Amino acid sequence: MGPARIVRHLPEIINNNCSFYGTDYNKKTIEWCKENIPEVKFNKNDLDASLPYPNDYFNVIYGNSVLTHLSEQLHHDWYNELYRILKPKGVMLLTTQGDNYKVKLSKPELKKYNQGKLIVRGNVKEGHRTYSAFQPKRFMKNLFSNSVILDHIERKPQKNWTPQDLWIIKK
């Protein structure tokens, strides 16, 4: 999921007869990807959590900064949709705006965040790149309660770079 910054490299890196798919909310991005990255099958998705793949279809799914643009309801809807299309024992990698992003929160938001509540700032259309969600560990662990959390990676911020958390889960 996302604008192909990562998936465009996978056919060359992995090169073992795998099939690669990409999906995104942005129609122009998908059109560009279809024209310029023929090794990957792309489709446009809507904001609603519905993908055109059968149950238990993918071995690996990744979403780089996808949940960071969704409401609490769509966190649940999209996680459930990704879980649906992930094969048993499949692995999902998702990035979130965790503790590194607490500095961006107001005092009332920080209090709620520290209580394990998702914080959403949405003065723009949901799904837009400036619609922002901040995901505390407790919220994410509850979201992934039907899966095994293999790892939760938090990296320290660097000058001019604030890394997102990486969650690696297994169905």
Annotate each PLM feature.
Residues 51-61:
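A short acidic, Gly/Pro-enriched loop at the edge of an enzyme's catalytic core
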Residues 2-50, 72, 76-77, 93-171:
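Class I (Rossmann-like) S-adenosyl-L-methionine-dependent methyltransferase catalytic domain
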Residues 59-73:
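A short SAM/SAH-binding and catalytic strip from SAM-dependent methyltransferases
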Residues 21, 64, 89:
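Short glycine-rich loop/turn motifs that provide flexible caps or phosphate-binding loops at active sites
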Residues 76-88:
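A short glycine-rich, Lys/Arg-flanked "PGG" loop and its adjoining helix->strand segment in the class I
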